[in-house]
């Protein structure tokens, strides 16, 4: 007779002539290799790419460098270059506002010849003009100067406009240039600021 109750497992009654029934043996699953094991790295890559059209041809062997060595390599690669101080407090060539103004005015009139006002076109044209003017000003060879170029397009609708700029700078070396092009439907204004950078 079987005992049944709470917490007691029932087992089949065995007679002396019967052999005990064994539970079906389930095959043990193989342990998945860790990606941190050197030998298993290529196997993991192959498993991941098995269903794709790529085949793993070659895998670089894992490096044996310690983490501390990697950090040292990165620090040296990211270090800033240090240059010797020249102790020069003024530019070799002072900014010549008149020659730059002539060049900027020439670029402005050439670029805007026969152009009608269109706000969508002018948004891209202002960027192109600023780039062209910046390249032209850099060709003058003013070393240690940083340039800021502002290109403004104003549609003529019978309004009055006042454009003002304020700055704090060194009056001995810093300067600015303005060039204007007026058409039937708009006014174009270019401001070039040259700031000496020691």
UniProtKB/Swiss-Prot annotation:
Assigned protein family: Belongs to the dynein light chain Tctex-type family.
Coiled coil spans: none
Organism: Homo sapiens (Human)
Keyword Transport attached: yes
Keywords assigned: Cytoplasm, Cytoskeleton, Dynein, Membrane, Microtubule, Motor protein, Transport
Classification lineage: Eukaryota, Metazoa, Chordata, Craniata, Vertebrata
Subunit architecture: Interacts with CCDC159. Interacts with CSNK2B.
Pfam families xref list: Tctex-1
Official protein name in the record: Dynein light chain Tctex-type protein 2
A GO molecular-function annotation: dynein intermediate chain binding
